[in-house]
Amino acid sequence: MGFSRGGQIALYASMRRFQKLWNESGIEIAAYIPFYAQCYAGYIDDSDVSGPIRLFHGVPDDYNPIAPCRNYVERLRQSGKDVQLTEYADTWHVFDSPTNPITPTALPAAQTVRNCVIKEDRPGHLINATSGEPFTWQDACVERGVHVAANPIALKATQDAVKALLTTVFKLE
């Protein structure tokens, strides 16, 4: 389970290629649960995943917009993977935080790659697909200015969904 950039890690940890590289223990992860993940990076063999994968995302999220996650989830579904994207209307980035106000709050200094297309052209090497150069946080596609807001209704729905998933994968009933 991970949130925002941690959600990106939770999502891409499902890739078998990364599991082979980094999982020396041999322990398998029961489920991958990314919250409002950034799905912009196209990795080599990124359709070869284990699962289940359950993503939770707000539709108006302008930090990590939902469209790339929709596209990635559709690609995974077409290849027969166990993946679901739960979308919440009127739900912004970090919707699960009780310290955020309910009304969208601007974070003008926060960086986002919402306008970037990032691809892995060889193992471990990410490029800005527009320029063909190695991706950096100084690239022109990197912007500042996002919004966050709590959504207690989406939080409760997500808690229920995660509980149901974990009950199933750990056979708790």
What is each model feature region?
Residues 1-50, 62-63, 67:
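Primarily recognizes the serine-hydrolase "nucleophile elbow" in alpha/beta-hydrolase
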Residues 5, 9, 68, 72, ...:
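Stable alpha-helical elements in mature extracytoplasmic
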Residues 14-19, 77-81, 167-171:
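Sec-exported extracytoplasmic/periplasmic mature domains
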Residues 33, 56, 84:
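Conserved Rossmann-like nucleotide-binding pocket used by diverse enzymes
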Residues 35-38, 59, 91-94:
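Active-site pre-Tyr helix/loop in NAD(P)-dependent dehydrogenases
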Residues 55-57, 61:
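Short beta-strand/loop motif that positions the catalytic acidic residue
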Residues 65-75, 100:
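Short alpha-helix in the alpha/beta-hydrolase fold that links the catalytic acid
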Residues 82-173:
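C-terminal catalytic histidine-bearing segment of alpha/beta-hydrolase fold enzymes
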